[in-house]
Amino acid sequence: IPPAGIDVGAEAVDALQANAAMVRKRWQQLIDAAKTDKQGSTALARLIDLEPEVLVFPRAVEMTIEQSIFYSPKALSDADRLLEIANERIDRIAAGASWAEVVSLGTSNEKQLLAGGYRSKIDDSFQPYGVVVPANVNVVDALPIRMDVWLHGRGEKVSELAFLNKHSNRPDRYRTGNEPMPQ
């Protein structure tokens, strides 16, 4: 059982809960629109496929609130950042973006980090993942490449919020196996 976190104040918690609820509301509006769309089943299937890539973020924030596991004041800004990512992904999905565009995977000369979610086959919940994408990967290239995948396990103070935050910034902290050892 994770230890109790710090008191971050009711006002901050209320603001995060409202922002998480807004993400969920915006997502539901997309689902409802797809149900009435002429191509409803295709549009709805696309949204269902992309749903974990969005809703894993408010879930992480809500779980952190429910379990009172904010371990530093910085975790509040991390939570805000994750909800911003969810909103940006909703905007991209509404614009018809591909999965790669939704998760911001592009061709880059730099390492990239992807953080998102998948739907658990055990309990249908959204579970976080992180992927380290090596530099110089072309998203349309069919050649096999090494990508390191991180799944959230158990940690005394590693909430899903902390996991998603860690795996969505600072790619320099990861080695992809095809680069020289640091000096």
Where do the protein language model's features map onto the residues?
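Extracytoplasmic/secreted envelope proteins and their assembly/folding machinery
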Residues: 13, 17-20, 24, 58, ...
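Short, charged, amphipathic alpha-helical segments
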Residues: 44-56, 73-84
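Amphipathic alpha-helical packing elements
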Residues: 56-57, 63
